[in-house]
Amino acid sequence: MDKGLAFDHIHLISRDPQATAEWYQQMFGGEITAVQDNLRGAPQLDVRVGGMTIVIRGQRPGEHPSATKPIHQFDGYSSHDEWGTDHFGFTYRGDLRAFCAELKRKGVRMAVEPWEFKPGLVLCYVAAPDGVSIELIQAG
C-alpha cells in the first residue's frame, strides 16, 4: 500500500567528504548541489547522481566510524558478508564492460569485474571511497 513514500537519499559518512563528493562528480557525472561547511560539527555535501541524492558528511565530534569489510566474490554472488546495507546500485544504459574500462582508466578500482550474473544480466561492483560498494547493472 502506497503511503506517499518516495526515495530521498543515501547518507554516507566520509573521511574526506569534499574529495568523496568530487569522486562521484568525476566518475559518475554527479553534480554537487549543496555544501555546508559545518552541519552539527561536520562538513556535508549533497551530490546528485542518476536521479538520486547522495549525502556525504564528515566525522562529527564524538563519532568513531569503523570501516566495513570489503566486498567479496563468492561462488555465484558478491557480498560484504555482514548485516546492514551491502551496496547501492545504478543501472547503466549502454555497454557496461566499456563503461567499466573507462572508469578504470580514470583510476576506479573494480571490486568485482563485470560478469554475467544470470543470462542477459551483466553487473559489476565499483570500490568507492570509504569502503562503499556500488553495483552497476547493464540495462537490458
Description of each model-found segment:
Residues 39-43, 117-122:
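Short acidic/glycine-enriched loop/turn segments that link adjacent beta-strands
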Residues 1-7, 13-34, 48-111, 127-140:
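Glyoxalase I/VOC metalloenzyme domain signal
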